[in-house]
């Protein structure tokens, strides 16, 4: 029987915000992943990084203030750092859960770059929330540095561009590991946004919506299923439709962005 190929997208609620929360959250997420593996599925996991990448960016900027020999870390570098440490916790949690069930299967994390279009309108209209809630004073300081900030119910948040993913650079590596029977963690936080420039890939000052990258990955891998684990109560039709309609039963069809 052909094994089902499933792309699982973990939202930020499945990862927590602080390091202790993340340690506990990935153990819960690992049980879900292990259930799929035990049922005979080949699994690729993507995950959010919205709180983490913003906090890394802020921490690196503050470190740069204290140590002037160090420059501020670009957003693309912060995305790479978040992929690494979230992948580390998630990979070990999945490995341990599989071993507890007597399943001997390698889990690997792939540092993943995702190409974006430099002319994407998102670069002129940043909307993606990152990092923790800021005070008014902190928000003013961020704006003085040229960063975008928006007011929320709880205070203020940094916002950055969120261009659409165009291509997944490491898709062949992901496919090879999946075909070899490994559990693969890839495109954390939507992947590291990069712009192709001749032979090189340059990091973009942006983050990518992980659900869009997950959809692209499912398409490129010819996956049987895309599973998005989220904390929202239910799925609704587009917010711009009139009226918005809540979906309460399974629907087979296309999801467009």
Regions found by a protein language model. Name each.
Residues 1-49, 55-65, 176-181:
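N-terminal glycine-/serine-/threonine-rich phosphate-binding loop
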Residues 22-27, 59-70, 124-132, 199-206:
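A glycine- and small-aliphatic-rich helix-loop capping segment at beta-alpha/alpha-beta transitions
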């Amino acid at each position: 029987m052909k094994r089902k190929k499933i792309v699982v997208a973990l939202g930020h609620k499945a990862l927590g915000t602080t390091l202790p929360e993340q340690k506990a959250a990935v153990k819960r997420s690992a049980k879900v992943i292990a259930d799929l593996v035990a049922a005979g599925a080949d699994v690729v996991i993507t995950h959010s990084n919205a709180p983490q990448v913003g906090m890394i960016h802020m921490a690196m900027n503050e470190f740069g203030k204290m140590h002037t020999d160090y420059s501020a870390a670009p957003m693309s570098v912060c995305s790479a750092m978040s992929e690494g440490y979230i992948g580390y916790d998630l990979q070990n949690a999945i490995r341990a859960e599989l071993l507890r069930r007597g399943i001997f299967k390698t889990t690997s994390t792939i540092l993943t770059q995702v190409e974006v279009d430099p002319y994407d309108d998102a670069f002129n209209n940043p909307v993606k929330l990152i990092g923790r809630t800021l005070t008014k004073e902190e928000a003013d300081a961020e704006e003085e540095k040229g960063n975008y900030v928006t007011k929320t119910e709880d205070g203020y948040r940094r916002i950055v561009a969120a261009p659409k993913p165009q291509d997944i650079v490491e898709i062949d590596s992901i496919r090879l590991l999946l075909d070899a029977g490994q559990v693969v963690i890839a495109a954390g936080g939507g992947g590291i946004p990069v712009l192709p420039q001749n032979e090189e890939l340059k990091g973009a000052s942006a983050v990518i919506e992980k659900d869009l990258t997950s959809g692209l990955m499912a398409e490129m891998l010819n996956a049987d299923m895309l599973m998005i684990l989220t904390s929202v109560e239910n799925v609704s039709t587009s917010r711009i439709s009139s009226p918005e309609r809540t979906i309460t039963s399974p629907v087979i069809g296309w999801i467009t962005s």
